[in-house]
Amino acid sequence: MSASAATGVFVLSLSAIPVTYIFNHLAAQHDSWTIVGVAALILLLVALLARVLVRRKPPRDPLFYVYAVFGFTSVVNLIIGLEQDGIIDGFMTHYLREGEPYLNTAYGHMICYWDGSVHYLMYLVMVAAIAWEESYRTIGLYWVGSIIMSIVVFVPGNIVGKYGTRICPAFFLSIPYTCLPVWAGFRIYNQPSENYNYPSKVLQEAQAKALLRRPFDLVLVLCLFLATGFCLFRGLIALDCPAELCRLYTQFQEPYLKDPAAYPKIQMLAYMFYSVPYFVIALYGLVVPGCSWMPDITLVHAGGLAQAQFSHIGASLHARTAYVYRVPEEAKIFFLALNIAYGVLPQLLAYRCTYNPEFFLRTKADEKLE
């Protein structure tokens, strides 16, 4: 493959601009099932066009076509976000009203912007890596965590929230959106990991240091304990814990947790059942040397938390959220400090495990014992 293939995918993704404009005007004249059929046909056509771009030298990695299609949908989501803000008009108006009305929520708005910016850049980078036959495992694992977190919250939230009675045929487009990232995740994980050629002496010296002799790791451990408590606390609020502290926190700090759209509740439950076990495992990995799986799981979790906190913070403050559920003006500084710190912690841990992995690598002696 050549660099021109990656450029072709970029141009193909930009074709979403005229396509959405035409699609919006045609959709106004047809029923919901026809709209779904046409949307599915467009996505299939994008995949076929991506295949045409590389017909002379097809990529070895079939995920090239997945990223090409998802890059197209990312531009669509960016268009949706811009239209919701009134910056553009006439591109997805009918679809937002009749196809997926839950995208009009504050949470839907935020994930559109995240997908249209962060995910879009990731797709372009991964397509370029495939074109140049380079490894993209690190950014791929980060993307897997990000997109799966959005699926885990957004799809169930559409069903159990206030829009559950307005599920339209377009909801079935979520099926490939859910299945493809899972398949992609397994393929990315099974790619060869980066080879670290550290001398055995360097690994032994790094792994001989106790936690107290690793100040940055010690700070991470303390922060992980605090983050675990924070996750459990907000998870209890999502489960309607009647404790006075939970009631006061909801009333004066994060009333958005009670939003009937249900996305914040599901997000807090995802933190409780996804992040808390991860924090426990990460604590073990920071104390016991040779946990070679640490870099991978920290990347996946960091991607998930980045997406989740961006969407949660944005939706909590967004004008589309009812005033009674928005963060009070006097609580904004504390709310932002707390939630940004919670979102930054996994990024720091992922950075530490990825770029200074000596403590987590197995020595040759350990490999021989296995």
Swiss-Prot record:
It holds the Pfam family EBP. InterPro entries: EXPERA (IPR033118), TM6SF1-like (IPR047195). PROSITE patterns: EXPERA (PS51751). Its main location: membrane. It is found in: Lysosome membrane. It is a multi-pass membrane protein. Broad expression. One of its GO terms (cellular component) is lysosomal membrane. Signal peptide: none annotated. Residues 60-185, 216-350 form the EXPERA domain. It comes from the Eukaryota. The chain crosses the membrane at residues 3-23, 34-54, 62-82, 110-130, 139-159, 166-186, 218-238, 268-288, 331-351. Keywords: Lysosome, Membrane, Repeat, Transmembrane, Transmembrane helix. Belongs to the TM6SF family. PANTHER family: TRANSMEMBRANE 6 SUPERFAMILY MEMBER 1, TRANSMEMBRANE SUPERFAMILY 6 MEMBER 1/2. May function as sterol isomerase. This is Transmembrane 6 superfamily member 1. It comes from Mus musculus (Mouse).
